[in-house]
């Protein structure tokens, strides 16, 4: 039994991480294209600023769809199981991304192009909205109770890895296609995603269901309407889970998406230099995210998360000061440090939120709380930053916006109910069920 559990534990981590990597590759690819490509391809008749706002607006639509995905897949994930939902969410994201790569431009088919872009972005948003809860729970629930932070952090590694792959693909195609990048080169990274989806499906189909969920089915404690149940019984947990992400979610999309627009348009930095800096920061995240998840098992999730909140708030003004020097070395420092501060929260975040909910409503509750932050923080952030920059002509207001997000997060962290979590998991019980095979 011990050997089987260890093997499944590895498979669960790999399946969760590979899947989230592919889904975040798809999602970040859209964000990068929204900053560099879509204003020209889908909104050519707008002014430069209006085109950027319109492109970021379509990006926000995807964020708005994420709570819908969390509710739909949370319902079935708490009733049917984690594994089946993860296969479905991966297919949704993959098909949506592939079809974006086939979309004609506005010059070819008019306004219909922008409408189709929005519809496919909604499909992406629903897919990624259902993805997070299932991937985190599959990994965390196969792990030891003493290592929940570390186990739950591995699906989070899909974010820097997806960012690394998407940014790398955009940079590669930008270099290979040159002036043709805005006509057809940008499409290749979207089309390639279908191959990655095939790999992800193979991996996910070969992992067993979470032992915690199997225990829920065995004890017949599955709720008929888990989404309604968790909204009724744990509204404070949902709200604090959402608002605790303000300092992580909003600044993150400024650090990886808005910075491309700000750097190229406002500071006249090159697109390639900014993409290179993002690649370096994302590579560091492959280590820093699981490290901070592990550290949260040692010093406590709330303390680790609180340190990250303070770090992001304290770096808000130095971040733009370093960018505004236009010095390549200092710009790199700004981007790397900002994402390390983010990772201090992102590593322990999955376990922090998931542990707030019981197993029979965990997919629904954790998913809803997590994805609500996408609407109130992540989605509007580039739009708010662009509007502040347009009205003031300065980055100072954006720094204050980041500080405000940190204050909201710290307040939510202090208000977050403490839930007694068992010092054993179903996987621990399976490990103890039989002696180690000799």
Whereabouts are the PLM-identified features?
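Extracytoplasmic gate region of multi-pass secondary transporters
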Residues: 31, 235-284, 378-381
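Cytoplasmic membrane-interface "Motif A"-like loop-to-helix N-cap segments
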Residues: 79-91, 298-309
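Glycine-rich segments within core transmembrane alpha-helices of 12-TM secondary carriers
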Residues: 149-174, 370-381
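Multi-pass alpha-helical transporter architecture, strongest
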Residues: 200-207, 404-430
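C-terminal transmembrane helical hairpin of 12-TM major facilitator-type secondary transporters
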Residues: 302-348
């Amino acid at each position: 039994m011990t050997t089987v559990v260890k093997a499944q534990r590895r498979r669960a981590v790999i399946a969760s991480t590979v899947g989230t990597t592919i889904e975040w590759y798809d999602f970040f690819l859209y964000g990068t294209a929204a900053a560099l490509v879509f204003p020209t391809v889908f909104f050519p008749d707008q002014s430069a600023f209006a085109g950027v706002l319109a492109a970021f607006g379509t990006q926000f639509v995807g964020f708005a769809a994420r709570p819908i995905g969390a509710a739909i897949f949370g319902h079935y994930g708490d009733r049917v199981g984690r594994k089946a939902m993860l296969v479905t969410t991966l297919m949704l994201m993959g098909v949506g991304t592939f079809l974006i790569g086939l979309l004609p431009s506005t010059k070819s088919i008019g306004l219909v192009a922008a409408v189709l872009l929005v519809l496919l972005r909604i499909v992406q948003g629903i897919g990624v909205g259902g993805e997070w809860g299932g991937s985190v729970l599959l990994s965390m629930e196969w792990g030891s109770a003493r290592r929940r932070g570390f186990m739950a952090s591995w699906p989070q590694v899909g974010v820097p890895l997806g960012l690394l792959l998407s940014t790398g693909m955009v940079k590669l195609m930008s270099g290979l296609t040159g002036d043709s990048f805005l006509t057809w080169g940008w499409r290749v990274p979207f089309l390639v995603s279908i191959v990655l989806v095939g790999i992800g499906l193979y991996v996910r189909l070969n992992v067993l269901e979470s032992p915690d969920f199997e225990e829920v089915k065995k004890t017949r404690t599955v709720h008929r309407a888990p989404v309604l149940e968790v909204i009724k019984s744990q509204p404070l947990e949902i709200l604090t889970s959402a608002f605790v992400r303000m300092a992580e979610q909003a600044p993150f999309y400024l650090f990886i998406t808005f910075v491309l627009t700000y750097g190229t348009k406002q500071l006249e930095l090159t697109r390639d230099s900014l993409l290179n800096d993002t690649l370096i920061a994302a590579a560091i995240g492959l280590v820093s995210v699981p490290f901070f998840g592990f550290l949260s098992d040692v010093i406590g999730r709330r303390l680790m998360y609180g340190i990250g909140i303070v770090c992001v708030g304290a770096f808000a003004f130095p971040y733009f000061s370093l960018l505004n020097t236009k010095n390549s070395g200092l710009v790199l420092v700004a981007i790397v440090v900002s994402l390390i501060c983010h990772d201090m929260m992102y590593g322990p975040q999955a376990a922090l939120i998931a542990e707030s909910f019981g197993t029979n409503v965990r997919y629904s509750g954790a998913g809803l709380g997590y994805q609500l932050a996408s609407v109130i923080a992540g989605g509007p952030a580039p739009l708010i930053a662009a509007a502040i920059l347009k009205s003031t002509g300065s980055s100072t207001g954006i720094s204050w916006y980041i500080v405000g997000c940190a204050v909201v997060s710290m307040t939510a962290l202090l208000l977050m109910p403490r839930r007694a979590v068992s010092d054993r998991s179903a996987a621990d019980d399976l490990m103890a069920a039989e002696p180690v095979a000799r």
